[in-house]
Amino acid sequence: MSIKSNKTEILGSIRSILIACIVLFSSSQIASAQRTMKGQYHLAAEAAFAADPRVPAGAEISFGAYLLDSYVIGWINVTPDFVTLPTDHQLGYIPINVGADYMYRVAATRARSVNLYVGGGVFLGWELYDPFRKVPSYIDTGFGKGNLIYGMAPAVESEFFIARRLALTLGARMPVSISSKTEILKLHIKAGIRINI
């Protein structure tokens, strides 16, 4: 065998490998459009962070389904926070909410491997006041043990598919708690994973 024929064989092999990679990449991009197809169910687990960095992170779990150009979800979240009392003590509280959202896709890559959604929904929950009994007992907070809360929550969310059934999520929700004794508006930043099932 001559050096020229070896070089030709090597170049041919490299060309074949490159063509195979291009075919695999393009087919995976086309297939990723099916990741958000109508009727596809998904589960998500996300950490929820308050706008104030001193507040510990909460958590959210959701189950939903993609529609033609949107998705719907049902969720439950727990998001601790605190308010400062007139006595300068901090009253911790934990809202525990269940809710439902409708999210409309406003932007996406052609293959839908990156999507941006805007929407919102409604929620119902219970606000638990001073769950760890950090406020001295002689101080009357006027809050009681807890309070029923409800309202609506506009939201924005992006998803970045890193595998056929796995996406990273990043978003924000601003619950408007009509009956809350602590805060009417409260911004949460969410980040987590979503698994298509």
Regions found by a protein language model. Give the residues of each.
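Short leucine-rich amphipathic alpha-helices used at interfaces
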Residues: 137-138, 144-145, 150, 194
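Residues that define the transmembrane beta-barrel architecture of outer-membrane proteins
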Residues: 39-41, 53-59, 90-98, 112-114, ...
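Short beta-turn/strand-loop junction motif enriched in small, turn-promoting residues
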Residues: 50, 105-107, 177
